[in-house]
Curated annotation (Swiss-Prot):
GO cellular component: cytoplasm
Alphabetical UniProt keywords: ATP-binding, Cell cycle, Cell division, Cell shape, Cell wall biogenesis/degradation, Cytoplasm, Ligase, Nucleotide-binding, Peptidoglycan synthesis
Intracellular or extracellular location(s): Cytoplasm
Metabolic or biological pathway, per its Swiss-Prot or TrEMBL entry: Cell wall biogenesis; peptidoglycan biosynthesis
UniProt function note: Cell wall formation.
Extent of the signal sequence: none
Gene name of the encoded protein: murC
EC number(s) from the headed UniProt entry: 6.3.2.8
Organism for this UniProt entry: Oenococcus oeni (strain ATCC BAA-331 / PSU-1)
Protein name: UDP-N-acetylmuramate--L-alanine ligase
Gene3D superfamilies according to UniProt: Mur ligase, C-terminal domain, Mur-like, catalytic domain, NAD(P)-binding Rossmann-like Domain
Keyword Cell wall biogenesis/degradation: yes
GO biological processes: cell division; cell wall organization; peptidoglycan biosynthetic process; regulation of cell shape
Length: 435
């Protein structure tokens, strides 16, 4: 048994890893801010202690895992160095865990969490599987055959990973506070691909992915084109989900149904099916997994309050926003769609304000909250009005105090809440207004 201490244990990846190491019989505790987050509830349920940032809590026999948002001069990091504790970054800690198993890393600018979650679910139904998902979910089985991990490109966090198999869902410019251009992003994915040992399943219609030439792994494409090795075709999108056929190497693999919406949902599902097929799972096994899948946290989660339908989604990049609104159109074809968007980081708003406008235009009406910063970026020269003022379908800037008054008036509509920050507080304010 090893003693692990996580600095920033409520982070989505950190919470997942903490749960995995706890499941594997280790002692786990960690520190974070007092603010309530959705990731803390599984930690509390597992009996994992969450402390403040007191440096005296760090012991020499701990393996200290430093969250990505914490600098080397953080008091607890300095304390770990002072007492001689083993100190790992989050990516280094993940690599130490996954190297003990046959590992599948899911990467990409968009769709990582949904694809990781679905693949982990399919495999877990029929084989002992550990997984680490970016929605704060993690499960660790010490002797598991497979380990499915979400591989985050931010700050090149996925560079230490050496997976047996990988998925690359797409390459797009995001995280403008770190990546300065699309070429910069592509170079990071190229480095990641060079570390994959066996095979990469990659979206075949992505022009940047086509430029990647891995040192060792071979690439099999998936997508909607006949030239893709795994080709989704005969697609029938309905309100209950999507029906489609899948061909493999020009021959029919099988017919599938999944409770997913939009082209992006079909692509993510195709990627998961391709990996499961490669690992030897049958079409029947895969379809059973698809039928019992209930989705990932904050990925198109649907609820109801009064006469309003609520969709909660993590979308925060223009590409993701457009995909989420398109998915809502498929699910609710006869409903009015009202987007409630929380911009995430000032650098994103500065870099993508026009793209946000174009994506949000596809909703019937748009409300925007103030910008959510981050631990790395708490202020900037952008503002939410930079987006709202350019929208022909603009509503208003909403706050916790006016969320109920503004949104409850959208009778019979679908409210699509999108954001990667704390947008749940606006949903909660709306729901409390009905109590």
């Amino acid at each position: 048994m090893t003693n692990y201490y996580f600095i920033g244990i409520k982070g989505t990846g950190m919470a997942s890893l903490a749960l995995i190491l706890h499941d594997q019989g280790n002692k786990v505790l960690g520190s974070d801010i007092d603010k309530e987050t959705f990731t803390q509830f599984p930690l509390v349920k597992a009996g994992i202690q969450i402390t403040d940032f007191d440096p005296d809590l760090i012991k020499s026999n701990y393996v200290v895992v430093k969250g990505n948002a914490f600098s080397d001069d953080h008091p607890q990091v300095l304390a770990a160095k002072k007492v001689g504790a083993k100190l790992l970054t989050y990516p280094q800690a993940v690599e130490e865990v996954i190297r003990r198993h046959f590992s599948i890393a899911v990467s990409g600018a968009h769709g990582k969490t949904s694809t990781t979650s679905l693949l982990a679910h399919i495999l877990s139904n029929f084989e002992s599987t550990s997984y680490l998902i970016g929605d704060g979910v993690g499960k660790g089985v010490f002797s598991s055959k497979y380990f499915v991990v979400e591989a985050d490109e931010y700050d090149r966090h996925f560079q230490p990973f050496t997976p047996d198999v990988a998925i690359i869902t797409n390459i797009d410019w995001d995280h403008p506070d770190y990546y300065k251009s699309l070429d910069d992003v592509k170079s990071a994915f190229s480095e990641f691909a060079d570390h994959v040992k066996k095979i990469i399943f990659a979206y075949g219609e992505d022009p940047e992915i086509k430029k990647i030439k891995p040192k060792t792994a071979r690439i099999l494409s998936y997508g909607f084109e006949k030239s893709d090795y795994f080709c989704a075709n005969n697609i029938d999108k309905r309100t209950e989900g999507s029906y489609f056929s899948l061909s493999k190497g020009g021959r029919k693999l099988g017919d599938f149904f999944a409770t997913i919406e939009g082209d992006h949902g079909i692509l993510d599902t195709t990627a998961a099916i391709a990996v499961a097929d490669y690992l030897g799972f049958s079409v029947d096994q895969i379809q059973k997994g698809l039928l019992t899948y209930q989705g990932a946290k904050r990925r198109f989660n649907i609820s109801q309050v009064a006469d309003l339908t609520i969709v909660d989604d993590y979308a925060h990049h223009p590409t993701e926003i457009k995909a989420t609104i398109d998915a809502a159109r498929q699910k609710f074809p006869n409903k009015r769609l009202v987007a409630v968007f929380q911009p995430h980081t000032y650098t994103r708003v500065n870099a993508f304000k026009d793209e946000y406008v174009n994506a949000l235009k596809s909703a019937d009406k748009v409300y925007i909250t103030p910008i959510f910063g981050s631990l790395r970026e708490k202020a900037g020269n952008a503002k939410s009005e930079d987006i709202l003022d350019k929208l022909p379908n603009a509503g208003a800037i909403i706050s916790e105090s006016n969320a109920y008054d503004k949104l409850s008036a959208e009778h019979g509509s679908v409210l699509v809440f999108m954001g990667a920050g704390d947008i749940e507080k606006y949903e909660d304010a709306l729901k409390k207004g009905f109590e």
